[in-house]
């Protein structure tokens, strides 16, 4: 094989590895990808504090024994699954820890700029310790609803349009 063919294969391999691994390449288990999805769908339209607060709730749950011990486990936790018409297992509407996961809509981010920001936040959040701006919150909800479970918890902070509890 001549040098040009080898060089082309190396460049092609690098490019394929770079582009195909962009979403998952930075962590083997896809934990940052899962966290980025949650930040995107729960707080993508909020300033940095709102995005970090959502990430903190997930981390607080990961560190608590009553929840799964991974970011993906916490985010995709659901009480009930059903079989769709295509034969796939899908979460039952209203039975998920985070509403976007079982709302029946696509889980593919549509706004690429917001997605990139959420992905960068998730990557650095998982790698580095952060001051918990939620004061240990394990739950939150939007300020325009009042779920039944909120009355039994202690409110910690109000950040952007979310109210946080522990």
Set out the residue ranges of the language-model regions.
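N-terminal secretory signal peptides that target proteins for export/translocation
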Residues: 1-2
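Hydrophobic membrane-insertion alpha-helices, especially the h-region
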Residues: 5-19
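Bacterial extracytoplasmic/cell-wall-associated proteins, especially those involved in peptidoglycan
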Residues: 19-166
